[in-house]
Structures are given as C-alpha cells and as structure tokens.
Amino acid sequence: MIRLFCGHDEREAIGTHVFISSVLRRTSQPVSFLPLNIKGMQRDGSNAFIYSRFLVPWISGYKGTAIFADGADMLCRADIAELWDLQDPHMAVQVVKHDYISQYTRKYVGTSMEANNESYSRKNWSSLMIINCAHYAWRKITPESIVDMSGPDLHRFTFIDERYIGMLPFAWNHLVMEYPHSQNVKIAHFTLGIPAFKEYRHCPFAGEWQDEVREVTRHIDANYE
C-alpha cells in the first residue's frame, strides 16, 4: 500500500480533489491518502500545511515510508507507483533538488492568497518528498520541537545530514511557469497558482488540470441533476 500524505487548504480545496483523482486514475497499486491540515501549525499567509508536512514521520509512529506532496496545487500525470519504487532505505528523505530564482515576484495573483513570492535556498524541495519515517534524523521532529524551529531550517532540512538527503528526478516535481514546458512531466506543480485562479487559467498543463476537474464532477453532474 502506497501511503500518500497530501496538503489540503480550504482556499484551494478543488486542487486537492483534482490531485487525488489524477493519482487514482493512473496508479497500478493501492494508495492510501491522508489530506494534511493540522490546525495551529500555520504561522503566516502561506498554505495551511506549510509546516505540518514535517510531522509525517511523527504521525506515522516513526515507522515505514510515506510520500508527501503539496497536492493541492499539483497534477499527477504518471503512475505514482513509479515514484514509490524510487525509495532508498539509506536516505532520510528524497526530494527534487531545485536550484532556481523565481521569475515572478508575486504568487496566487488576484486571490485572497496573493503574497510575495520570495526566492531562497532549496525553495520547493519539501513540496514533494519520499520520507523514510524510520530514519533516526526524524526523531528530533515532534509537535513540540517544531514550534521552536524556523521555517527556513525546516524547509532546508538543516536537521538532516546532507548525506541522507537523496535526489529525485525533476519530472516528479515540475514547477509550472518556472521550468521549460515538457511532455515528460510526471507531476506538474502549479506553485504560483492553480488553473482555477483567473491569472493561471491558460498556463501550461491548465487544460489537463481542467479535464481532471470535469472527471471529478461528471458523475455528480449525471446523478444529482
């Protein structure tokens, strides 16, 4: 069973449903989903799961492996089992190691979520993770300890020895509008804003995202007219 924790924010709830649907329609293995939104962990105007993602090992009893994906602003275009098969038991965490400066100074433009889009070291590394919950490096991360840690320390994995931060292929966390368009993308990450928002309605992969919305709602439309 693939365990997949995905971010959920009520302000872009449709995005969570789209992501889950896109995973389920393509997976070759059973998937267990846990939308993640732990109250009280949000410290700023960012999404509701910005810090709670680091509690996945604690939630899991420091056992097994799990995937965390931002989810609410992602579209899965491949079999999630392919990602699951990339897990390395020697690593504490595996991520796509982005190294970029954003082309955009604002994100979620035109919505109540609109905010500055700051560039910083290891930006978006934590937005897609294969987490080895049993690795000793995670033992220091608890609901109590996380309160005293800064956002940058968490998102840059300063609590994990560099040797135990593994690399995943870029196709599994493609930053839409930041990276050149490619049809080989496995997970499209609408990090600036999902196509439900007017500003991003025609961005790359928006058509596929909107097709997934129709897939999510078509049975409702047919059965509850």
Where are these regions (language model features)?
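A glycosyltransferase accessory/donor-loop signature
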Residues: M1-F5, R11, H17, S28-Q29, ...
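Alpha-helix N-cap/loop-to-helix initiation residues
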Residues: E12-A13, C76
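Short amphipathic alpha-helical segment that frequently serves as the phosphate-/nucleotide-binding helix
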Residues: A13-S21, Y51
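Short, acidic, metal-binding catalytic loop of nucleotide-sugar glycosyltransferases
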Residues: S22-P30
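Active-site-proximal specificity loops/subdomain of glycosyltransferases
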Residues: V31-Y62
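A short acidic, often aromatic-flanked loop/helix-cap motif at beta-alpha or helix-coil junctions
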Residues: K39-R43, I101-Q103, N173-M177
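GT-A fold catalytic core of metal-dependent nucleotide-sugar glycosyltransferases
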Residues: S52-Y104, I130
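Conserved catalytic core of nucleotide-sugar-dependent glycosyltransferases
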Residues: D85-D153
